[in-house]
Regions:
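N-terminal membrane-targeting/anchoring modules of bacterial envelope and secretion proteins
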Residues: 1-577, 592, 740
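Short, contiguous clusters of charged residues that form electrostatic/catalytic patches at enzyme active sites
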Residues: 210, 583-586, 590
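Lipolytic serine-hydrolase domain surface
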Residues: 547-586, 627-629, 635-746
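Conserved acidic catalytic loop of the alpha/beta-hydrolase fold
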Residues: 587-599
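Gly/Ala-rich beta-loop-alpha elbow adjacent to hydrolase catalytic centers
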Residues: 604-614
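Active-site signature of alpha/beta-hydrolase-fold catalytic machinery across serine-
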Residues: 615-619
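Short helix-capping segments at alpha-helix termini
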Residues: 621-625
Length: 746
């Protein structure tokens, strides 16, 4: 090898140290910073059997997604926003700019912001300010609440309404603080794509900072509008004036303007391959109008009006929650129908994960998480305020308990969530049990070919390998569980939405309350169970975030989901966790461009690092790509991304990537790997490729473990490596040297 070649290693999910990535005890950073940096072995430390011209370098980006436990919990708090943002990226190929899926997804995201604000309003303004504070038994012995009882109604509501604004500002701060090291990182792009479909090779694809700012202004206006409407609606009910009506109508005009802006494309159309500039028309006026209306609404609310003492729920709040659920049900149905229509037009939809319905599944999961959080928050606060008596539509409060009445919609949503959780759990168990025999038979065939004549003492180890191979294929068997979840979510949100028309579960509970006590008690127990189960699920998500710091397996599982969700830009919900790829991809592109000025580069991506590598290469110009080769290992490019996000990383994109780099591409995979897999051809060594050349030459299977018997110079059998590590396998080094020899030194 007469020319210098740098093997640039990019790690996968859950991160790893630069020392482990380079398999070297002493490393030094040569570029980047503490968040994401490039490292090399320090010269003079350790021996290497590689040629001097073949150097190793590592890109460590794990700090972009990892952090303290407090940060992880704050990101889990943003889970619903992340899921709805992911929906638009999981759409089927459309051949256009996304069709209806983009606008519908943005509207769904706005309803989640509205639901968030309504849940905070429900706790502060409704439960505390309207229902608890005027009721002396509720504030007795609670000095932190007793002072509110001495305030007039208007000032009390205005003071408590500051908390939803603070919560909205917290969301803004979380996203803004975390994105400072991600967004607005200089991004290039080769601009070779055509057509209207947004593609990963578009210039500026990974620079959406202005899009996020635009969405953030709209969502803040939505949140403030929902708060203003809640305050003014209550004021109109107790003391109607023309000023209140004018402000109320103005707030709804503001919300309508937000809907229009969300339906419009975020970027202006342009001729050519590049992306148009962000359309910021009307955003400044929207921001000024939203702030002005909020100040006026607070000013009107704070004036003491001497109304009748409040009783029951905050006027209009129950109906507002029910109306929001109705809108969400309609939008989710439109999203599902649109996805089904576009799925029929896509290439090979049966090969897609979730049968091409990933977009509505993610949206439904976002709603489930959002209402799980909301129901747990509202009902647990109500449970605390009324001193342990759980409000129930079919069972009256105990004598002497504060008559708190949270929105019954949350209760029905929790019950629907309980039904969905139970059915999904049953479907998952059933599916795993039904496929166990087939997976075991497949594992028997694989292990039998890898180890045809094992010694008798290796039979227990052989059984372990069979079990690992069988478990590695479980993920592909869970499609029915997710589809059941989608169907039940659509049915559940539709049934809950019927409350708005007087034919929903609330009317059923009222009829049951006048009949036999058994039916009433059964309904009460079911809804109570729903509240507790959904609350436990929400708590479990938070606990999972903490456990990920103690268990490597848990951390890896959480990281797979989290790194997938935060890989894509925030083009739907601005309060989703920030997109780390908006820094990682341009940074990798810049480093590769600099290195190719001195020689060749082999970008070696493990697991999710292979996705970053592919996205980076799609942004590089042809003169740089002529000096680049790609080595992927443990890669989910086809197993997960091509099937989950076919519009952006589908098979046509992967074939185009191979052509751009002259098919200087090797992919290593194992049957024991539950995450990675083949990309083009799942053939074994000695078998003909299942795809025509040159794509059929990319995939190379590694036997794992290397043997099931104890080597003569060891005391234990070789480990079952599963998903990590790959770089310690002899086939890995052989692939690196092969690709280095195929690089053009010119």
């Amino acid at each position: 090898m007469a020319h210098e070649v740098v093997e640039l290693r990019v790690h996968g999910v859950s991160g790893t140290s630069a020392e482990a990535l380079l398999d070297h005890p002493v490393v030094t950073r040569v570029a980047g910073d503490d968040h994401a940096g490039f490292y090399r072995p320090r010269p003079g430390f350790g021996d290497s059997d590689r040629p001097a011209e073949l150097r190793a370098e590592a890109y460590r980006w794990g700090a972009l997604t990892a952090g303290s436990a407090a940060r992880t919990l704050s990101l889990l708090f943003l889970l619903p926003f992340m899921l709805v943002n992911l929906a638009v990226w999981a759409r089927p190929p459309t051949g256009g700019a996304g069709g209806l899926i983009g606008p519908v997804s943005r509207l769904l995201a706005a309803t989640l912001t509205a639901a968030f604000v309504l849940s905070i309003v429900g706790v502060t303004v409704d439960l505390v300010g309207w229902q608890c504070a005027p009721y002396r038994p509720c504030v007795r012995g609670r000095p932190y609440l007793a002072w509110l009882a001495d305030l007039p109604l208007g000032p009390r509501l205005a003071v408590l309404a500051l908390l939803p604004i603070a919560a909205l500002r917290l969301l803004w701060w979380l996203g803004e603080r975390s994105s400072r090291v991600f967004e607005a990182f200089p991004a290039g792009g080769q601009g070779r794509s055509g057509g209207a479909e947004d593609r990963l090779d578009r210039p500026g694809f990974w620079n959406d900072a202005l899009v996020v700012q635009r969405l953030r202004a709209i969502h803040v206006a939505v949140g403030l509008g929902v708060l203003d409407a809640s305050l003014l609606g209550a004021q109109i009910h107790i003391y109607s004036t023309p000023i209140a009506h004018v402000l109320f109508v103005a707030v709804w005009v503001l919300l309508a303007a937000c809907v229009v802006l969300l339906c419009l494309p975020a970027r202006r159309p342009v001729d050519g391959p590049g992306r148009g500039p962000v359309d910021l028309r009307g955003i400044r006026a929207l921001r000024v109008t939203a702030n002005t209306l909020t100040v006026l609404a607070f000013g009107y609310t704070v004036v003491p009006l001497e109304p009748q003492p409040p009783h029951g729920q905050l006027p209009g709040y129950e109906g507002g929650v029910a109306a929001l659920v109705t809108v969400q049900a309609a939008l989710l149905a439109v999203l599902a129908a649109t996805t089904l229509h576009q799925r029929r037009r896509s290439h090979n939809p049966a090969a897609s994960w979730l049968s091409g319905l990933a977009a509505p599944v993610f949206a439904a999961a976002a709603f489930a998480a959002a209402y799980g959080y909301s129901a747990a928050l509202v009902y647990r606060v109500a449970d605390f305020l009324d001193r342990g008596e759980i409000p129930n539509p079919a069972r009256p409060n105990a004598p002497g308990a504060p008559p708190l009445e949270p929105p019954v919609t949350y209760r029905w949503a929790a019950l629907a969530g309980l039904v969905a959780v139970l059915f999904v759990a049953v479907t998952t168990v059933w599916r795993i049990a039904m496929t166990r025999r087939r997976r075991r038979r497949m594992a028997e065939e694989i292990v039998g070919r890898d180890f045809p004549e094992p010694p008798p003492e290796a039979l227990p180890r052989l059984a372990d390998v069979r079990a690992v191979v069988a478990r590695a294929g479980v993920a592909e068997q869970l499609n029915p569980a997710f589809l059941v979840f989608l169907v039940l979510s659509l049915l559940g949100v539709t049934v809950v939405a019927l409350d708005l028309f007087g034919i929903g579960p609330s009317s059923l509970s009222e009829r049951l309350a006048g009949t036999s006590g058994q039916a009433t008690m059964a309904l009460a127990l079911a809804t109570d169970a729903g509240i507790y189960v959904i609350g436990l699920v929400a708590l479990g998500i938070l606990v999972l975030g903490l456990l990920s710091y103690r268990s490597e397996e848990t951390r890896r599982t959480v990281a797979v989901i989290w790194d997938l969700g935060t890989f894509w830009p925030r083009t739907v919900h601005p309060f989703a966790p920030p997109c780390y790829a908006e820094r990682a991809v341009p940074e990798l592109a810049r480093r590769i461009t600099a290195l190719t000025g001195k020689g060749g580069v082999i970008i070696s991506g493990h697991s999710h690092g292979s996705v970053l590598a592919a996205a980076t290469l799609l942004q590089l110009p042809a003169d740089v790509l002529s000096r680049v080769a790609l080595l992927t290992h443990g890669s989910p490019l086809h197993r997960l991304y091509a099937r989950l996000c076919p519009a952006f990383l589908g098979d046509p994109t992967l074939h185009e990537l191979g052509e751009r780099i002259g098919w200087r591409w090797v992919n290593l995979w194992r049957d024991t790997d539950p995450i990675g897999g083949p990309i083009f051809s799942a053939h074994r060594p000695g078998d003909p490729p299942r795809a025509p050349a040159p794509a059929g030459t990319v995939d190379r299977r590694l036997r794992d473990p290397l043997d099931v018997a104890v080597p003569p110079d060891d005391t234990v059998p070789p480990p079952i490596n599963r998903h990590w590590p790959y770089h310690t396998d002899p086939m890995y080094e052989a692939a690196v040297r092969e690709l280095a020899g195929r690089l053009d030194p010119a």
